[in-house]
Amino acid sequence: MSGRRVLALYAALLFGFAGVLCRLFYLASRTDYAARAAAQSTVTLELPARRGGFYDCMGLPLTGLEKRWLALCFPGQENYTRLYACTDTAGQELLYRSRSRAAPFLVEVDRDMTALGIPCYAASRRYAAAPLCPQLLGYLDGEGHGAAGLEKALDALLTGSGARDTLLCPVTAQGNLRTGEQVQHLQADSGAVGVRLTLSRSVQRAAEAVAAQTMTTGCILVLDVRTAALRACVSVPGFDPADPAASLEAPDSPFLNRALQAYAVGSVFKPVLAAAALEAGLAPEYDCNGAVVVDGQIFRCAGGVPHGEVDLSAALAKSCNGYFIRLGQQLGAQALLQQAQALGFGRSIGLAEGLTAQSGALPGAEELTQSGQLANFSFGQGSLLATPLQVSAMMNTIANGGVYRAPCLLDCTLDETSGEELSAFARPQAERVLTEQTAAALRTMLEQTVAEGTAQDASGLPGGAAGKTGTAQTGQFTAEGKERMNLWFAGFYPAEDPQYTIVVLQDGQTQAAVSSAAVFAQLCTALHWLG
C-alpha cells in the first residue's frame, strides 16, 4: 500500500473518532437526554392506598388501630438475611422469590428498621387482631375496595380518587441505590375522608365482651335513648375481616348481621298491644286459667300455668298469652296494625345508602280477619317478623316518652389530618306516636316485669331496669326433634333516667346457657362502671 493511501486511511479513522467524541459530548451536554437516562434507572414503587377510616362518636378510631411497617429492600444477601427474621411467612416467601431480583421491592416487617439502615414506611393495618363490629363495618376485596357493610356502602367517600404515595428509587444496573442519591417519597392526595359513626368504642367493646362470654348465636344492640343513635351493634359468631375467606365454610353464618335480619318475635311484641290499649283507654281484667280456645284452637300460656285474675300490668309482667289474645280481640285488627306501624314494625330502617335492615313482616288486615291469626298476632306469633333494630326502636320510643326515632348510625365526614367535621349526615325526624302518659305507664309496667315478672334475671341493677322477655317459636327443629326458639330481651337502663335501650336476641336456640335478660344485666353492669 502506498504511503498516500495509508495517510488517507489514518485521516479517515481520525475524523471518525473525532465525530464519535463530538457526538458523545453533545449527548452529555443535553439535559433532556440526561433526564431520560436517569428515568430509565429509577424504579417507582407504590405504597398502599390511604383509605378513610371509621371513627366512633368521640372521634376514636374503629379501624386502623394497629400500625404496620413496609421495608424498602434493595438487592443483597445481607438485606435479605436481616429482614427474614422480621417478617411473616408471606414476607419470607417474597424474600426468597426475590433473592435474585435486580430491583428494590417492599416487604412488610414487624418493626421500624430505619435506624438499622433499611428505610421503612408506616401504614395502618385496616383491621385489628380483635376487630370491632365486623358485620357492620364489613371488609375489603382484593383491590382494596369495600365488599360488604359500611365499607361497601361508603366506598366512594373512603376511597376518593385512589391515588397512592409513591417511592422513586434511583438505582444502579444491579438494582442498588445509586451512590449519593436518596429515595424520594411523593405523597398523593386522594381526597379520601374519614367517617364518624354514632357508635361508642367503649360500649361496643363492652357489648362484644359480654356476647363472647354468654352467647353462641345472636346479637346485641345498644341505642342512646334521647337520639336513637346506635352505640353498639354486635352479631355473633363473628369473623376476621382481614381474612374473610377463612370463615367461608364456618357454621352459624358468621357474615350475617343478625341485627338487620327479620325473626319471629314472640312476647317482646306485647308492649305494642299494651300501648294500643292505653291509647284507647282500655285496661280490662281477665281471669287466666292457663289456656284460651279460639275457634277450636287452644292457645296456652307458658307451661299451661294459670295466672288467675290479672290486669294489664300483671299480664305484661307474667307474659299472659290468654290476656293479650282477649285484648287483641277487644281492640281489633285495625287498631293493632296501626299501633305496630306507628312503632316502626313493617318498615325498613336504612343505616346508610346501600345498607338497610330488612322490613320484617306484618300480617295483612285480611289475614287478621281469621280469629286464629289475630290470636297469634296478639302475642307476637304467626306471620309477624321483625328485626332486632325494629324492636329496639319500639322499646326506645317507650323509654323516650313516646317519641319515635328511627335508629341512626352515620354522624359526619371528617378531615383525618385535622379531625375537622366536613359535612353532617341527615338524621331521621322525630315523631310522637304515644302520649307521655301512655309511655310513662308502660315504663312502670316494664319495671314491674323486671322486678316481679318473667324478666327477673335483669333485676338488682343500680338504678333499676325495665324490659320484656320473649320466646318465639320458629317452626324449625333439630335432628332430635327439639324446636329452635328465638330468645329475646328488650329493655332500657337505668329505669330511673333511661340512658340506653338494649336488645338481646339469641336466635335458633333450644336452650341458652345464659338467658337474654341475664345477658342484658351483664351489659348494664359494664355500662354502669363505664359511667
Where are these regions (language model features)?
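Periplasmic/cell-envelope proteins involved in peptidoglycan metabolism and beta-lactam response
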Residues: M1-A245, L337-A342, L505-G531
